[in-house]
From Swiss-Prot:
Catalytic activity: [GlcNAc-(1->4)-Mur2Ac(oyl-L-Ala-gamma-D-Glu-L-Lys-D-Ala-D-Ala)](n)-di-trans,octa-cis-undecaprenyl diphosphate + beta-D-GlcNAc-(1->4)-Mur2Ac(oyl-L-Ala-gamma-D-Glu-L-Lys-D-Ala-D-Ala)-di-trans,octa-cis-undecaprenyl diphosphate = [GlcNAc-(1->4)-Mur2Ac(oyl-L-Ala-gamma-D-Glu-L-Lys-D-Ala-D-Ala)](n+1)-di-trans,octa-cis-undecaprenyl diphosphate + di-trans,octa-cis-undecaprenyl diphosphate + H(+)
Organism placement in taxonomy: Bacteria, Pseudomonadati, Pseudomonadota, Betaproteobacteria, Burkholderiales
An annotated GO cellular component: plasma membrane
Cited function: Peptidoglycan polymerase that is essential for cell division.
EC number: 2.4.99.28
Pfam families reported for this sequence: FTSW_RODA_SPOVE (PF01098)
Descriptive protein name: Probable peptidoglycan glycosyltransferase FtsW
Amino acid sequence: MNSAAAGATPNTRTSRFGGWFRRARSGIDSLPVHLPVRLGGAGIAQTKATPMRVLGFDQALVWVTVALLTWGLVMVYSASIALPDNPRFARAGYGASFFLTRHAASVAFAFIAALLAFQIPMKTWERAAPWLFVVSLLLLVAVLIPHIGISVNGARRWLPMGFMRFQPSELAKVAMVLYAASYMVRKMEIKERFFRAVLPMGIAVVVVGMLVMAEPDMGAFMVIAVIAMGILFLGGVNARMFFVIAALVVVAFGTIVASSPWRRERIFAYLDPWSEEHALGKGYQLSHSLIAIGRGEIFGVGLGGSVEKLHWLPEAHTDFLLAVIGEEFGLVGVLLIIGLFLWLTRRVMHIGRQAIALDRVFSGLVAQGVGVWLGFQTFINMGVNLGALPTKGLTLPLMSFGGSAILMNMIALAIVLRIDYENRVLMRGGRV
């Protein structure tokens, strides 16, 4: 054995290794990565970024997700505890804990599905993206077929799956994230050409939109359209072209609203929910949501103390869960929920930027697409509950009652965690 090596102490070896590691890291960090997509600045081409520090498992993202799921579970029980007294549910034999049990089972099933989704490499997701998109289209067609799709309150949105009702439009959100990201990767060289790159994606969105609007579910279509547009923009589509498309989409949605009498009525009710004409009609949910939030004041009336959930506020355990949170936890609780979702969205977007910095464009766009989805849907749901936006049937991600939504939210976040995991493997010098 070499005498110098034999005489080296453990501290000496550690310091040598530490010095070597620091030099290697500084060499890696000094290498710019040229990115073909937007990272938040004005430029697109030749954007430079470096991977962030190497850490272990992203525990913060997991714990924030767990916190939202747990709080949602508690609030679904609180908001639904009086529903079995409703004759509609009483005839079906629903007990006081029916919705809690169903929601807990949905969360457990979603957790198992998320664990399985996490095991799938991003290369596999990229290859499967077009096929998953086709499957989502077929399910959207199937739900419209009589005696196959389940109709509730005039909307045909669910497929019977035995232990749960599955909503294909939720799968379409995940499918659109993956498909749009893989599409942009394939079209990266011609992304500036409208007819070869942008138009085919627009046609795909229109096809999905026609199927979703036939249910009808305008809220889901809005989310899917924003996901596609967000990924196109983040993928580096010409800004001028993007804003022209955005303007056309806004005009299209405006035309849909203007041509539908009951949608126009919703807009009028949103503008004046307290009027005698709307207070007991289209403005009923909004007015009682505002009453609930107003009753909560700063610190709320306490967990379980909500009055509006006692058959006054419709859909208190789904679309208007935030109103019950505002009543029971007050402004403090609402601000905490907003803060958690802001952090979650920012972290997911950051993981996407980190993947792009490692030249993993598909993974980066998928993560950012999930961030756009969760951030936009949360914004719409909160805006509706607070009276800032017209009433729209969108749930609060990770919290509201709804098995399909919870399942797809968890799978989407599992994919993001997979992206983060692969980022860390690459930064350690491994392969994925």
